[in-house]
Amino acid sequence: MSARFPVVTGLGIIAATGINVDEIWNAIRTGTSGLKPLTLFQSPRYGQIPTGEISHDLVTLGAPTRGSRSDQLGWLAARDAIASAGIDLS
């Protein structure tokens, strides 16, 4: 039996430095940090620790309204990876 290797055909990412591959790649090239004060929830350590929070409204970006925030972030990244791969799911 021959070995089978995975192949990356598309990329999708959402992070504190950007909401797509181009924005994040630009942040890497320019040395832009995504660390900033926490805004999504209250914390007793507010202002003491910088956070890499994704503060965008995920539903506005096209995420489903159901599921956890982690589900929504994963869905957005997967959607971009599928589009980047040129796969049409319709």
Which residues does each PLM region occupy?
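Conserved "HGTGT" condensation-loop signature of ketosynthase/thiolase-family condensing enzymes
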Residues: M1-S90
